């Protein structure tokens, strides 16, 4: 864990890396507006769940947050779900893992929202997280992990993107990137242990499956990422938890460690792993690219982000891989596109270099 006394030094490292990234984004890699870094907040896990997110919420206009919730729910949640929302929440609330439900209830109370709306907006984000994730090993055995998170509602979500340091016993237990009001994580790092990102695996009939799975006590996708970051003590333990824990929907979990060969893509069914795809650098397979499609199947021509990413990594070369060049790969169209909300690059062995940059800012 990192002490809070190092926060200023870490912030300086973030700025230095950000400057290098901005200087490197020239030529064919990117034609976008210069990205920006999101705000950084602390969330104390030593505080009661009802108190954890309140300091962060005070930095945002409640009316804007309520508008964001209404827009996401109105667009992502089917009408048949909205029509029976009260009944649904009353049925699944007792099955939702803690402390997440109490945290959501507190956020709702602060914003004068119903618990039903709070739970729905947290679950709605789980339905459409289109992404590109890369885990790779350089020629010296260092592991790097990067991801783009693509999502609708860019004008709103870019304003709600934040980095969060989760504090336990006065130390940084883990770090993640999330949206204000969303208690899960799609991107995170446990310092000196492992990194995780999640990519949606769309199998259809999502809401029906979700409601059925919640009633069985299965975990939401992003909540398991946060739980794993909080509780797992090693790369191996994280992979086991992410592979075996029952989920409300299918997903791809991408995990990076701190030692050579510690990188893997876990293709998940709701009940368990469908496939485990580790790095194999001794046989020249020093990176893994995961978008939103099973890696053993061709990527659809209408959404092939995989092939450009692979070509860019091969052009970069293992000897030249680092966080800056990985960011460049994630800045190549269509890996980077109009729906990209943020890009994160990270390495668990160097946790102070965790960096998220907001893309396509207005």
From Swiss-Prot:
Mod. after translation: N-glycosylated. Tunicamycin treatment causes a reduction in specific activity against N-palmitoylethanolamine.
GO BP, sorted A to Z: fatty acid metabolic process; lipid catabolic process; N-acylethanolamine metabolic process; N-acylphosphatidylethanolamine metabolic process; sphingosine metabolic process
Location, primary (coarse class): other
Topological category with respect to the lipid bilayer: Peripheral membrane protein
Name of a matching Pfam family: NAAA-beta
EC number: 3.5.1.60, 3.5.1.23
Compartments reported by the entry: Lysosome; Membrane
Catalytic activity: N-hexadecanoylethanolamine + H2O = ethanolamine + hexadecanoate; an N-(long-chain fatty acyl)ethanolamine + H2O = a long-chain fatty acid + ethanolamine; N-dodecanoylethanolamine + H2O = dodecanoate + ethanolamine; N-tetradecanoylethanolamine + H2O = tetradecanoate + ethanolamine
Name of the protein this chain belongs to: N-acylethanolamine-hydrolyzing acid amidase
Organism: Mus musculus
Species classification: Eukaryota, Metazoa, Chordata, Craniata, Vertebrata
